[in-house]
Amino acid sequence: MKFAGTSLWRLVFGALVWVGLQSVAMAEVRGIDWLELIPPEELKEMESQPIVDHNGTPIAPDYSNSHPVLTMNGVEGRIPGYIVPITVTEENTISEFFVVPYFGACIHVPPPPPNQIIYVKPEKPIEMTEIWAAYWIEGKLKLENQANSLGQSSYSMELTSVTPWEG
């Protein structure tokens, strides 16, 4: 009888472990907001800027010296954004790209501040069917500067997945 009880206990324990692992696997991925990537003091400064007068001579503030939020290093999650291709392969896949918070960023001058651009170099190039669409970019954030002719980023991401955004 003792053998049967031990086997039953092992079976129940194994089932509980399996259920626990399934719950972890199905857990909601942490959402990352673009404002989380801006240090509070810089965000406060940005919010205190006057409304732009489009009829006058606009002088855009220079945010090129923006800083990353150090506590975001190593955060795993997903962020919505637009993909700006940096390198496109012969197969028409993207092997390097920036993720930006709004459509047209990096194409227009000036680009967003570096702490509002995430550099991604996936292990395998990704296929893009809708370059104008928003996507969920999921992975692990790292503090890492990358610069090229399209812009400069303060963050990079170890990519887990890219999926179409559904709001």
Please tell me what each predicted stretch does.
Residues 2-12:
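Bacterial N-terminal signal peptides that target proteins for export
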Residues 13-18:
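Hydrophobic helical h-region of N-terminal Sec-dependent signal peptides
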Residues 21-27:
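Sec/Tat signal peptide C-region and signal peptidase I cleavage site
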Residues 27-167:
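OB-fold and OB-like single-stranded nucleic-acid-recognition modules
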